[in-house]
Amino acid sequence: MANLNKRFQVIQTFSQTVVALAAAVLLLGCGPLEPHARGARDSAAAARPAPSTAALNQDFGRCPQFFAGGRAPAVAIGGRLRALCFDNFAVLHSGETRTPVYVAERLNREILLKAKTVQRHDRFFADARLPSGERADLEDYRGSGFARGHMAPAADMPTDQAMAQSFSLANMVPQNPRQNSGPWARVEEDTRKYVMRAQGDVHVITGPVFADQRTIGRNGVRVPSHLFKLVYDPATGRAWAHWQQNQPDAKVNKPLSYAAFQQWLNLDLLPGVKVR
């Protein structure tokens, strides 16, 4: 992970506001990033049976459909990365940060229409496919002041099983409660509105960015400084990204072009795809 631990500066212009973000580490442990691991304590009550797909280091061969062109982004870092396939999304998980590096979805109008009929049940659980020394557990979030923030939103899930899977802590990051229920929820809803208008599948990749070393819980779950959501529409060839601070006063800003987003992250989240 040392090779990702490089100093870079992100300059964003949002409504005439320029934000300089120095020494930020992203996607990995990475899009997420920066190693963070401590001893973990398992809770039998917290760990529930997870989806049957096994975790295979960065190998999404069992669920390529969630990635544009069937190709997952390659994250050039050390170990403790595990690919997790769920019914309606895929997670690249970092055992260093104990959070997703990114979460990929393939959405369309049919999926979202079905999702509107699914009742939500907030039953969070530690993902049993991850080693106890690499995952978050329910106690890490308890009393932390942070919400368990979905990367693949529960409101995107078209079946009861997919809904239940979305509450895996492998799909969560520590998120400011006001940001989670306010400006970030609006980004999620705006994305769904776009998908409902789109002509076919839309690929969405969501993840955290870490600019400091803040953690919660005895397992040291990293707290992201920012969140991003990348949207790609194959029918139009267009892609854009939302970028938002993990703060109570976060704002919904104009989306970034994919070119600018990719340059800042120095990471290609759409490998092999020609974006207009």
What is each residue range found by the language model?
Residues N5-V19:
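Bacterial N-terminal signal peptides that target proteins for export
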Residues A20-A24:
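Sec-dependent N-terminal signal peptides
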Residues L28-G29:
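C-terminal motif of bacterial Sec signal peptides marking the signal peptidase cleavage site
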Residues L33-R98:
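N-terminal module-boundary/linker segments of secreted carbohydrate-active enzymes
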Residues H36-P51, H93-P100, M157, P177-Y194, ...:
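N-terminal short leaders/motifs
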Residues A83-A147:
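Short, His- and charge-rich active-site/binding loops that engage polyanionic ligands
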Residues A128-R276:
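Domain-level detector of nuclease and nuclease-like folds
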